[in-house]
């Protein structure tokens, strides 16, 4: 166990000025970060079920990549009992466990040096639709993770969650208007100003804007639940053939955009469709285990924003959520077809979904820079 309660060195320049860029998720990784789930007003049974699931995710990742887990001091002993022995526990305080959104975006340069971008965070909407209050501890998470690796830190003047962006490492950034242009994120910035900041801090050239994300996604439609890059020039889209499903017009609109765009290198996109699980709904028993607090209520009968697109690429494997016996095998086979050189590892992930996200949301990769 280590302690990361010290800030990282802050830079005054911007990554693009310094020759740094955000690499694609399939670039070599030196580590993956996760955070311990414990909020009783978001995770049933004070996180017990989620903790067991996070341990399985960490174990699946650990076969390919070292795993670090941020854990508040009060839960370290408990985490040591639950987590696989290969997971490095780091004392980091947090309001919740979404490492993708509160962790840093690590950027690299041609020499393999790594630095981190620390974005502003307001719990997915602040006082205008945010998911909990306060979020002060979450705002400190990225700097503490960067300190653990000895990386210098860029502080970006933009409210942004890691799950709201995907890049191909070759100049293209994909996102959703539903999230990035939402009035509860950066109300004083125009689309053009947001793009300019993303150019500065991700060093990207071209943007693919999808209008909306997955139906009932409480993050305001994060791209990482809806669509991702598989490799340069190829994307994977969350899809349903059911035209009566509320998800259909969202996926169809996204498909129309993807079919009529090119990436930063001028390539037309090859589009893979990944089937929607379910639809899935929160049960009475599952909702009863969540206590009242400042978090979003977990209501019986509420539709869950389940998506197989919410997977992690980590070195030689794909760790993806098992969500529905009717479609899990189909999703696994499609992923194997898309990633023939990767090992496809499914982890039962309903407990993560009940808390509002999935495997990609609870992980944040640290690229090797090589």
Swiss-Prot record:
Keyword Hydrolase set for record: yes
Alphabetical keyword list: Hydrolase
Molecular-function annotations in GO: agmatine deiminase activity; protein-arginine deiminase activity
Keyword Hydrolase: yes
NCBIfam families per record: agmatine_aguA (TIGR03380), PRK13551.1 (NF010070)
Gene3D superfamilies assigned: L-arginine/glycine Amidinotransferase, Chain A (3.75.10.10)
UniProt-listed Enzyme Commission number(s): 3.5.3.12
Name of the molecule in the record: Putative agmatine deiminase
Reactions mediated catalytically: agmatine + H2O = N-carbamoylputrescine + NH4(+)
GO biological process terms held by the UniProt record: putrescine biosynthetic process
Protein family according to the UniProt entry: Belongs to the agmatine deiminase family.
EC supergroup of this enzyme: hydrolase
Transmembrane intervals: none
One Pfam family linked to the record: PAD_porph
Active-site residue numbers: 361
């Amino acid at each position: 166990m280590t302690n990361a309660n010290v800030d990282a060195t802050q830079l005054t320049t911007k990554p693009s000025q310094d020759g740094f860029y955000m690499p694609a998720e399939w670039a070599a990784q030196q580590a993956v970060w996760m955070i311990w789930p414990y909020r009783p007003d978001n995770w049933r049974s004070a996180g017990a079920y989620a903790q067991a699931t996070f341990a399985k995710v960490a174990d699946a990742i650990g076969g390919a990549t070292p795993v670090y887990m941020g854990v508040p001091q009060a839960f370290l002993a408990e985490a040591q009992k639950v987590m696989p022995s290969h997971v490095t526990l780091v004392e980091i305080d947090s309001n919740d466990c979404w490492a993708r959104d509160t962790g840093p975006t690590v950027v690299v340069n041609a020499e393999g040096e790594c630095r981190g971008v620390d974005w502003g965070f307001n719990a997915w909407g602040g006082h205008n639709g945010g998911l909990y209050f306060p979020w002060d501890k979450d705002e400190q998470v990225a700097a503490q993770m960067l300190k653990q690796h000895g990386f210098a830190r860029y502080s970006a003047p933009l409210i942004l969650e890691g799950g709201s962006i995907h890049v191909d490492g070759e100049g293209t950034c994909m996102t959703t208007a539903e999230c990035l242009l939402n009035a509860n994120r950066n109300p004083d910035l125009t689309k053009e100003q947001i793009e300019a900041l993303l150019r500065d801090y991700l060093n990207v050239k071209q943007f693919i804007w999808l209008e909306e994300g997955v139906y009932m996604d409480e993050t305001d439609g994060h791209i990482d639940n809806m669509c991702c890059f598989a490799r340069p020039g190829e994307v994977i889209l969350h899809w349903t053939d059911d035209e009566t499903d509320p998800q259909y017009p969202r996926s169809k609109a996204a498909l129309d955009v993807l079919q009529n765009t090119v990436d930063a290198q001028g390539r037309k996109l090859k589009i893979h469709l990944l089937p929607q699980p379910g639809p899935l709904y929160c049960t009475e028993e599952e909702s009863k285990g969540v206590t009242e607090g400042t978090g979003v209520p977990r209501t019986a009968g509420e539709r869950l924003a389940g998506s197989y697109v919410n997977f992690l690429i980590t070195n030689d494997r794909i760790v993806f959520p098992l969500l529905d016996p009717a479609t899990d095998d189909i999703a696994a086979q499609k992923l194997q077809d898309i990633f023939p050189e990767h090992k496809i590892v499914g982890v039962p992930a309903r407990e993560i979904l009940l808390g509002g996200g999935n495997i990609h949301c609870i992980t944040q990769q640290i690229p090797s820079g090589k």
